[in-house]
Design a protein with these regions (language model features):
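Functionally important transmembrane alpha-helices
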Residues: 17, 21-29, 172, 177, ...
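Membrane-interface helix/loop boundary segments of multi-pass membrane proteins
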Residues: 145-170, 197-204
Length: 261
């Protein structure tokens, strides 16, 4: 039985990579070869194809998530509530603040400068630089798909054969590696750890999704906002580091109290 759960994370990540590339290929062929839309027009509106791809991925992985854990549907979980929704957003903002500090450091290290440049170029290319497309893909769709995959499927499978702390750490490292950029991998791993802690505590996928959403929202705003607004955003996310740390530490202490009862 444990061997089955050991294989699920590997197979789920492989399925995501394979399905993403296959869907993009099919959409591209459909648009260029069937509808005979020019490559330039396709590039200008390719974000609609990406949104469609993410919609399919959400459907596929949410269905897989439900099928895998259908027998555990009655497990205790924290209902959605304003306090935890706000707390999750604060954690996401705080993680973004730490990420900003890490990127500033990485920019000063010659060995990491190319990784920072590649990461920035990749962010600019999301949805062809279209604000609406970037919001729908990076801020809404990506957090849903990735949290279902890495917290709902990968992490939850690892709970079956590893201690909670080890499962959170390993799944978070996989989440970081998945981003294929050493600078991005570092802060994605940190975000994965905090999202994993909240999911382990609450057993409600909405909370890690909100952490991811808040982080990506700030990143998007920084990419589109003028420099004056960016300065205010930077101050805001730095201020959020302390309350974010408090919320995560409080969750860990509550876990310990629950274990001792």
């Amino acid at each position: 039985m444990k061997k089955r759960y050991f294989a699920i994370p590997i197979l789920a990540i492989a399925l995501h990579l394979l399905l993403s590339n296959l869907l993009y290929f099919l959409v591209e062929r459909l648009v260029l070869d069937v509808f005979h839309i020019s490559p330039q027009q396709f590039m200008n509106y390719s974000y609609w194809g990406e949104i469609l791809i993410y919609a399919v991925l959400i459907l596929v992985f949410f269905t897989l998530y439900k099928l895998l854990w259908r027998k555990e549907i009655s497990e205790p979980r924290t209902a959605t509530n304003f306090k935890d929704v706000l707390g999750s957003l604060v954690v996401g903002f705080g993680i973004c603040g730490i990420s900003g500090l890490w990127i500033m450091l990485a920019e000063q290290l010659p060995s990491l400068q190319k990784s920072v440049e590649a990461m920035n170029a990749g962010a600019e290319n999301i949805a062809g630089g279209n604000a609406f497309g970037t919001f729908m893909i990076a801020v809404i769709a990506a957090p849903v798909v990735e949290e279902i995959l890495f917290r709902g499927i990968v992490l939850r499978s690892m709970w079956k054969f590893a201690p909670a702390w080890a499962a959170i750490l390993i799944s978070s490292v996989l989440f970081g590696v998945y981003h294929l950029n050493i600078v991005q991998a570092a802060y994605a791993t940190l975000m994965g750890i905090t999202a994993g802690i909240l999911y382990e505590k609450k057993r409600n996928l909405l909370f890690p999704i909100l952490v991811h959403f808040a982080n990506n929202l700030i990143t998007m705003l920084q990419g589109f906002a003028p420099s004056e607004v960016n300065e205010l955003i930077s101050i805001f996310i730095l201020i959020m580091i302390a309350p974010a740390g408090y919320i995560v530490c409080r969750s860990l202490r509550q876990d310990k109290r629950a274990d001792s009862m």
